[in-house]
Amino acid sequence: MTNIRKTHPLMKIVNNAFIDLPAPSNISSWWNFGSLLGICLMLQILTGLFLAMHYTSDTATAFSSVTHICRDVNYGWIIRYMHANGASMFFICLFMHVGRGLYYGSYMFLETWNIGVILLFATMATAFMGYVLPWGQMSFWGATVITNLLSAIPYIGTNLVEWIWGGFSVDKATLTRFFAFHFILPFIIMALAMVHLLFLHETGSNNPTGISSDVDKIPFHPYYTIKDILGALLLILALMLLVLFTPDLLGDPDNYTPANPLNTPPHIKPEWYFLFAYAILRSIPNKLGGVLALVLSILILVLMPLLHTSKQRSMMFRPISQCLFWILVADLLTLTWIGGQPVEHPYIIIGQLASIMYFLLILILMPTASTIENNLLKW
Protein backbone atom coordinates (compact mmCIF):
# COMPACT_ATOMS: atom_id res chain seq x y z
CA MET A 1 0.00 0.00 0.00
CA THR A 2 1.33 3.45 -0.93
CA ASN A 3 2.05 5.79 1.95
CA ILE A 4 -0.91 8.10 2.74
CA ARG A 5 1.35 11.15 2.68
CA LYS A 6 1.99 10.51 -1.03
CA THR A 7 -1.65 9.90 -2.00
CA HIS A 8 -3.89 12.12 0.16
CA PRO A 9 -4.54 15.40 -1.73
CA LEU A 10 -3.64 17.66 1.24
CA MET A 11 -0.86 15.50 2.68
CA LYS A 12 0.69 15.32 -0.78
CA ILE A 13 1.15 19.11 -0.85
CA VAL A 14 2.80 19.09 2.59
CA ASN A 15 4.91 16.08 1.60
CA ASN A 16 6.19 17.72 -1.57
CA ALA A 17 6.97 20.98 0.24
CA PHE A 18 8.47 19.80 3.55
CA ILE A 19 9.25 16.07 3.51
CA ASP A 20 10.26 14.59 0.15
CA LEU A 21 11.36 17.95 -1.27
CA PRO A 22 14.70 17.51 -3.07
CA ALA A 23 17.08 20.05 -1.48
CA PRO A 24 20.72 20.91 -2.28
CA SER A 25 23.12 19.02 -0.01
CA ASN A 26 25.25 22.08 0.73
CA ILE A 27 22.90 24.88 1.83
CA SER A 28 24.26 26.64 4.92
CA SER A 29 22.57 28.14 7.99
CA TRP A 30 21.87 31.28 5.94
CA TRP A 31 19.05 29.20 4.38
CA ASN A 32 17.41 28.80 7.82
CA PHE A 33 15.83 32.25 7.84
CA GLY A 34 12.92 31.34 5.54
CA SER A 35 11.56 28.84 8.06
CA LEU A 36 12.37 31.23 10.93
CA LEU A 37 10.28 33.92 9.22
CA GLY A 38 7.41 31.41 9.00
CA ILE A 39 7.74 30.74 12.74
CA CYS A 40 7.88 34.50 13.47
CA LEU A 41 4.73 35.06 11.41
CA MET A 42 2.79 32.31 13.21
CA LEU A 43 3.99 33.61 16.58
CA GLN A 44 2.94 37.18 15.70
CA ILE A 45 -0.50 36.03 14.51
CA LEU A 46 -1.07 33.99 17.69
CA THR A 47 0.15 36.62 20.18
CA GLY A 48 -1.65 39.31 18.17
CA LEU A 49 -4.91 37.37 18.30
CA PHE A 50 -4.76 37.16 22.10
CA LEU A 51 -3.86 40.85 22.36
CA ALA A 52 -6.81 41.75 20.09
CA MET A 53 -9.14 39.97 22.54
CA HIS A 54 -8.34 42.62 25.16
CA TYR A 55 -7.38 45.68 23.09
CA THR A 56 -9.80 48.51 22.28
CA SER A 57 -9.14 50.64 19.20
CA ASP A 58 -10.60 53.87 20.52
CA THR A 59 -8.44 56.91 21.28
CA ALA A 60 -10.00 57.29 24.74
CA THR A 61 -9.23 53.73 25.86
CA ALA A 62 -6.43 52.33 23.62
CA PHE A 63 -3.55 53.32 25.92
CA SER A 64 -5.42 52.11 29.03
CA SER A 65 -6.32 48.81 27.35
CA VAL A 66 -2.62 48.07 26.70
CA THR A 67 -1.84 48.89 30.36
CA HIS A 68 -4.75 46.63 31.36
CA ILE A 69 -3.30 43.79 29.24
CA CYS A 70 0.08 44.15 30.98
CA ARG A 71 -1.31 44.46 34.52
CA ASP A 72 -4.56 42.53 34.76
CA VAL A 73 -4.70 39.90 32.01
CA ASN A 74 -3.19 36.50 32.89
CA TYR A 75 0.31 36.50 31.37
CA GLY A 76 -0.76 39.55 29.36
CA TRP A 77 2.64 41.20 29.88
CA ILE A 78 4.46 38.26 28.29
CA ILE A 79 2.02 38.15 25.34
CA ARG A 80 2.44 41.91 24.78
CA TYR A 81 6.24 41.82 24.97
CA MET A 82 6.49 38.67 22.84
CA HIS A 83 4.45 40.50 20.20
CA ALA A 84 6.50 43.72 20.38
CA ASN A 85 9.90 41.99 20.46
CA GLY A 86 8.67 39.30 18.05
CA ALA A 87 8.42 42.09 15.47
CA SER A 88 12.09 42.91 16.07
CA MET A 89 13.09 39.25 15.65
CA PHE A 90 10.93 39.14 12.50
CA PHE A 91 12.87 42.05 10.99
CA ILE A 92 16.25 40.64 12.03
CA CYS A 93 15.34 37.42 10.19
CA LEU A 94 14.01 39.46 7.23
CA PHE A 95 17.22 41.47 6.86
CA MET A 96 19.34 38.29 7.13
CA HIS A 97 17.10 36.57 4.55
CA VAL A 98 17.33 39.46 2.07
CA GLY A 99 21.08 39.82 2.71
CA ARG A 100 21.54 36.11 1.98
CA GLY A 101 19.59 36.57 -1.27
CA LEU A 102 21.84 39.46 -2.30
CA TYR A 103 25.09 37.68 -1.41
CA TYR A 104 24.32 34.36 -3.09
CA GLY A 105 22.44 35.73 -6.12
CA SER A 106 19.06 34.25 -5.14
CA TYR A 107 17.44 37.25 -6.85
CA MET A 108 17.93 35.43 -10.16
CA PHE A 109 14.71 33.54 -9.30
CA LEU A 110 12.67 36.53 -10.51
CA GLU A 111 9.15 35.57 -9.37
CA THR A 112 10.30 34.39 -5.94
CA TRP A 113 12.40 37.54 -5.46
CA ASN A 114 9.66 39.97 -6.53
CA ILE A 115 7.06 38.33 -4.28
CA GLY A 116 9.69 38.61 -1.53
CA VAL A 117 10.00 42.37 -2.09
CA ILE A 118 6.19 42.69 -1.92
CA LEU A 119 6.30 40.67 1.32
CA LEU A 120 8.92 43.07 2.71
CA PHE A 121 6.72 46.08 1.93
CA ALA A 122 3.64 44.37 3.43
CA THR A 123 5.55 43.49 6.61
CA MET A 124 6.85 47.05 6.96
CA ALA A 125 3.31 48.42 6.54
CA THR A 126 2.00 45.98 9.16
CA ALA A 127 4.74 46.85 11.66
CA PHE A 128 4.19 50.59 11.16
CA MET A 129 0.45 50.30 11.81
CA GLY A 130 1.05 48.04 14.82
CA TYR A 131 3.33 50.68 16.35
CA VAL A 132 0.46 53.19 16.24
CA LEU A 133 -1.96 50.98 18.21
CA PRO A 134 -0.69 51.48 21.82
CA TRP A 135 -1.50 55.19 21.29
CA GLY A 136 1.54 56.53 23.12
CA GLN A 137 3.35 59.73 22.15
CA MET A 138 5.64 58.04 19.61
CA SER A 139 2.66 56.09 18.20
CA PHE A 140 0.71 59.28 17.55
CA TRP A 141 3.57 61.42 16.25
CA GLY A 142 5.07 58.57 14.23
CA ALA A 143 1.70 58.09 12.53
CA THR A 144 1.37 61.85 11.94
CA VAL A 145 4.86 62.26 10.45
CA ILE A 146 4.89 59.14 8.25
CA THR A 147 1.35 59.52 6.86
CA ASN A 148 2.08 63.22 6.24
CA LEU A 149 4.84 62.19 3.81
CA LEU A 150 2.12 61.29 1.31
CA SER A 151 1.22 65.00 1.11
CA ALA A 152 4.43 65.37 -0.95
CA ILE A 153 2.67 63.62 -3.86
CA PRO A 154 1.80 66.38 -6.33
CA TYR A 155 -1.84 67.46 -6.77
CA ILE A 156 -3.55 64.61 -4.86
CA GLY A 157 -1.21 64.54 -1.81
CA THR A 158 -3.26 66.55 0.70
CA ASN A 159 -6.55 64.86 -0.21
CA LEU A 160 -4.87 61.46 0.02
CA VAL A 161 -3.52 62.14 3.53
CA GLU A 162 -6.92 63.34 4.80
CA TRP A 163 -8.57 60.30 3.22
CA ILE A 164 -6.13 57.97 5.04
CA TRP A 165 -6.61 59.87 8.32
CA GLY A 166 -10.40 59.87 7.98
CA GLY A 167 -10.39 63.52 9.11
CA PHE A 168 -8.11 66.53 9.39
CA SER A 169 -5.64 64.92 11.79
CA VAL A 170 -4.64 61.53 13.18
CA ASP A 171 -7.62 60.68 15.41
CA LYS A 172 -10.24 58.01 16.27
CA ALA A 173 -10.94 57.08 12.64
CA THR A 174 -7.21 56.64 11.95
CA LEU A 175 -6.64 54.39 14.97
CA THR A 176 -9.67 52.20 14.17
CA ARG A 177 -8.71 51.68 10.52
CA PHE A 178 -5.06 51.03 11.43
CA PHE A 179 -6.23 48.30 13.82
CA ALA A 180 -8.39 46.77 11.08
CA PHE A 181 -5.50 46.80 8.58
CA HIS A 182 -3.01 45.58 11.19
CA PHE A 183 -5.28 42.59 11.83
CA ILE A 184 -5.88 41.64 8.18
CA LEU A 185 -2.39 42.21 6.71
CA PRO A 186 -0.62 39.26 8.44
CA PHE A 187 -3.10 36.89 6.78
CA ILE A 188 -2.36 38.50 3.41
CA ILE A 189 1.35 38.07 4.24
CA MET A 190 0.70 34.39 4.98
CA ALA A 191 -1.00 33.93 1.60
CA LEU A 192 1.86 35.75 -0.16
CA ALA A 193 4.40 33.58 1.69
CA MET A 194 2.67 30.50 0.27
CA VAL A 195 2.97 31.98 -3.25
CA HIS A 196 6.63 32.78 -2.46
CA LEU A 197 7.18 29.09 -1.60
CA LEU A 198 5.20 27.94 -4.64
CA PHE A 199 7.50 29.90 -6.96
CA LEU A 200 10.60 28.73 -5.07
CA HIS A 201 9.59 25.07 -5.44
CA GLU A 202 9.21 25.57 -9.20
CA THR A 203 12.96 26.10 -9.47
CA GLY A 204 14.32 24.53 -6.28
CA SER A 205 16.61 26.27 -3.81
CA ASN A 206 19.77 28.12 -4.73
CA ASN A 207 22.97 27.11 -2.87
CA PRO A 208 26.15 28.89 -1.67
CA THR A 209 28.13 28.10 -4.85
CA GLY A 210 25.42 29.42 -7.19
CA ILE A 211 26.00 26.33 -9.36
CA SER A 212 23.11 23.99 -10.26
CA SER A 213 22.68 21.35 -7.55
CA ASP A 214 20.46 19.03 -9.62
CA VAL A 215 23.19 16.37 -9.57
CA ASP A 216 23.33 16.30 -5.76
CA LYS A 217 19.99 16.50 -3.96
CA ILE A 218 18.97 15.16 -0.54
CA PRO A 219 15.45 14.88 0.97
CA PHE A 220 14.36 17.86 3.07
CA HIS A 221 13.32 15.53 5.90
CA PRO A 222 15.15 14.61 8.17
CA TYR A 223 18.23 16.66 7.16
CA TYR A 224 16.79 20.15 6.96
CA THR A 225 13.84 19.62 9.32
CA ILE A 226 16.28 18.97 12.18
CA LYS A 227 18.40 21.94 11.05
CA ASP A 228 15.30 24.17 11.03
CA ILE A 229 14.32 22.96 14.51
CA LEU A 230 17.75 23.97 15.83
CA GLY A 231 17.33 27.40 14.20
CA ALA A 232 13.85 27.73 15.72
CA LEU A 233 15.15 26.88 19.21
CA LEU A 234 17.88 29.53 18.91
CA LEU A 235 15.32 32.08 17.67
CA ILE A 236 12.97 31.37 20.58
CA LEU A 237 15.91 31.50 23.02
CA ALA A 238 16.94 34.94 21.70
CA LEU A 239 13.34 36.19 21.77
CA MET A 240 12.69 34.98 25.32
CA LEU A 241 15.98 36.45 26.59
CA LEU A 242 14.82 39.78 25.18
CA VAL A 243 11.26 39.45 26.52
CA LEU A 244 12.16 38.25 30.02
CA PHE A 245 15.26 40.36 30.73
CA THR A 246 15.09 43.59 28.70
CA PRO A 247 11.57 43.83 27.21
CA ASP A 248 11.83 47.60 26.61
CA LEU A 249 15.38 47.60 25.21
CA LEU A 250 14.23 48.19 21.62
CA GLY A 251 11.20 50.35 22.45
CA ASP A 252 10.94 54.10 22.95
CA PRO A 253 10.32 55.48 26.48
CA ASP A 254 8.10 58.19 24.92
CA ASN A 255 5.55 55.50 24.13
CA TYR A 256 4.80 55.14 27.86
CA THR A 257 3.34 58.65 27.74
CA PRO A 258 -0.25 58.73 26.40
CA ALA A 259 -0.67 60.41 22.99
CA ASN A 260 -0.99 64.19 23.25
CA PRO A 261 -1.58 66.17 20.02
CA LEU A 262 -0.59 69.41 21.84
CA ASN A 263 2.89 68.24 22.86
CA THR A 264 5.47 67.17 20.26
CA PRO A 265 8.29 64.87 21.50
CA PRO A 266 11.79 66.37 20.96
CA HIS A 267 12.93 63.51 18.71
CA ILE A 268 10.35 61.70 16.60
CA LYS A 269 11.75 58.42 15.34
CA PRO A 270 10.32 55.06 14.21
CA GLU A 271 11.21 51.61 15.53
CA TRP A 272 14.87 50.58 15.03
CA TYR A 273 14.14 48.44 11.95
CA PHE A 274 12.98 51.50 9.97
CA LEU A 275 15.81 53.82 11.02
CA PHE A 276 17.98 53.14 7.94
CA ALA A 277 15.15 54.21 5.62
CA TYR A 278 14.27 57.14 7.92
CA ALA A 279 17.89 58.34 7.74
CA ILE A 280 17.76 58.26 3.91
CA LEU A 281 14.45 60.19 4.02
CA ARG A 282 15.92 62.88 6.31
CA SER A 283 19.16 63.23 4.35
CA ILE A 284 17.36 64.96 1.45
CA PRO A 285 16.22 68.55 2.24
CA ASN A 286 13.33 68.33 -0.25
CA LYS A 287 10.10 66.64 0.90
CA LEU A 288 9.18 64.86 -2.35
CA GLY A 289 12.83 63.95 -2.97
CA GLY A 290 13.07 62.43 0.50
CA VAL A 291 9.91 60.37 0.01
CA LEU A 292 11.17 59.09 -3.37
CA ALA A 293 14.55 58.17 -1.85
CA LEU A 294 12.75 56.39 1.01
CA VAL A 295 10.66 54.27 -1.37
CA LEU A 296 13.59 53.65 -3.73
CA SER A 297 15.83 52.51 -0.87
CA ILE A 298 13.67 49.36 -0.66
CA LEU A 299 12.33 49.25 -4.23
CA ILE A 300 15.94 49.12 -5.50
CA LEU A 301 15.84 45.41 -4.58
CA VAL A 302 13.61 44.84 -7.63
CA LEU A 303 16.47 46.09 -9.83
CA MET A 304 19.02 43.60 -8.45
CA PRO A 305 18.56 41.04 -11.29
CA LEU A 306 19.09 43.85 -13.85
CA LEU A 307 22.22 45.08 -12.04
CA HIS A 308 23.77 41.59 -12.01
CA THR A 309 26.67 41.81 -14.47
CA SER A 310 28.76 38.89 -13.17
CA LYS A 311 29.12 35.60 -15.06
CA GLN A 312 28.87 33.87 -11.68
CA ARG A 313 25.66 33.84 -9.69
CA SER A 314 27.01 33.79 -6.13
CA MET A 315 29.58 36.05 -4.46
CA MET A 316 31.27 32.99 -2.96
CA PHE A 317 34.20 33.18 -5.41
CA ARG A 318 34.16 36.96 -5.98
CA PRO A 319 36.36 38.72 -3.37
CA ILE A 320 35.91 42.30 -4.69
CA SER A 321 32.10 41.97 -4.64
CA GLN A 322 32.30 40.38 -1.18
CA CYS A 323 34.23 43.39 0.08
CA LEU A 324 31.64 45.80 -1.36
CA PHE A 325 28.79 43.71 0.07
CA TRP A 326 30.18 44.03 3.61
CA ILE A 327 30.78 47.76 3.06
CA LEU A 328 27.05 47.95 2.16
CA VAL A 329 26.18 46.15 5.42
CA ALA A 330 28.37 48.61 7.38
CA ASP A 331 26.70 51.48 5.51
CA LEU A 332 23.23 50.23 6.48
CA LEU A 333 24.33 49.96 10.12
CA THR A 334 25.64 53.55 9.91
CA LEU A 335 22.29 54.70 8.47
CA THR A 336 20.45 52.86 11.28
CA TRP A 337 22.57 54.70 13.86
CA ILE A 338 22.07 58.09 12.14
CA GLY A 339 18.29 57.56 11.90
CA GLY A 340 18.11 57.51 15.70
CA GLN A 341 20.18 60.69 16.16
CA PRO A 342 18.90 64.30 16.27
CA VAL A 343 19.06 66.42 13.10
CA GLU A 344 22.24 68.40 13.84
CA HIS A 345 25.91 68.57 12.87
CA PRO A 346 27.77 66.13 12.41
CA TYR A 347 24.86 63.64 12.02
CA ILE A 348 23.35 65.45 9.01
CA ILE A 349 26.46 65.18 6.84
CA ILE A 350 27.20 61.59 7.95
CA GLY A 351 23.63 60.62 7.01
CA GLN A 352 23.90 62.31 3.61
CA LEU A 353 27.23 60.62 2.84
CA ALA A 354 25.90 57.22 3.98
CA SER A 355 22.77 57.70 1.82
CA ILE A 356 24.85 58.57 -1.27
CA MET A 357 27.13 55.61 -0.51
CA TYR A 358 24.11 53.26 -0.28
CA PHE A 359 22.83 54.05 -3.79
CA LEU A 360 26.36 54.36 -5.21
CA LEU A 361 27.30 50.87 -3.98
CA ILE A 362 24.19 49.16 -5.35
CA LEU A 363 23.80 51.04 -8.64
CA ILE A 364 27.41 51.63 -9.71
CA LEU A 365 30.18 50.07 -7.61
CA MET A 366 28.87 46.50 -7.30
CA PRO A 367 28.00 46.05 -11.03
CA THR A 368 31.41 47.57 -11.92
CA ALA A 369 33.20 45.21 -9.52
CA SER A 370 31.39 42.25 -11.13
CA THR A 371 32.58 43.33 -14.59
CA ILE A 372 36.17 43.72 -13.31
CA GLU A 373 35.99 40.20 -11.81
CA ASN A 374 34.78 38.82 -15.15
CA ASN A 375 37.76 40.43 -16.89
CA LEU A 376 40.22 39.17 -14.27
CA LEU A 377 38.98 35.64 -14.98
CA LYS A 378 39.22 36.42 -18.74
CA TRP A 379 35.48 35.69 -19.18
Swiss-Prot record:
Cofactor binding, per record: Binds 2 heme b groups non-covalently.
Top-rank taxon, per record: Eukaryota
A Pfam family matched in the record: Cytochrome_B
Record: residues binding heme b b566: 97, 196
Keywords: Electron transport, Heme, Iron, Membrane, Metal-binding, Mitochondrion, Mitochondrion inner membrane, Respiratory chain, Transmembrane, Transmembrane helix, Transport, Ubiquinone
Classification via SUPFAM superfamilies: a domain/subunit of cytochrome bc1 complex (Ubiquinol-cytochrome c reductase), Transmembrane di-heme cytochromes
Membrane topology: Multi-pass membrane protein
Subcellular location: Mitochondrion inner membrane
Family to which the UniProt record says this protein belongs: Belongs to the cytochrome b family.
Misc remark: Heme 1 (or BL or b562) is low-potential and absorbs at about 562 nm, and heme 2 (or BH or b566) is high-potential and absorbs at about 566 nm.
Identification of the protein by name: Cytochrome b
Gene behind this protein: MT-CYB
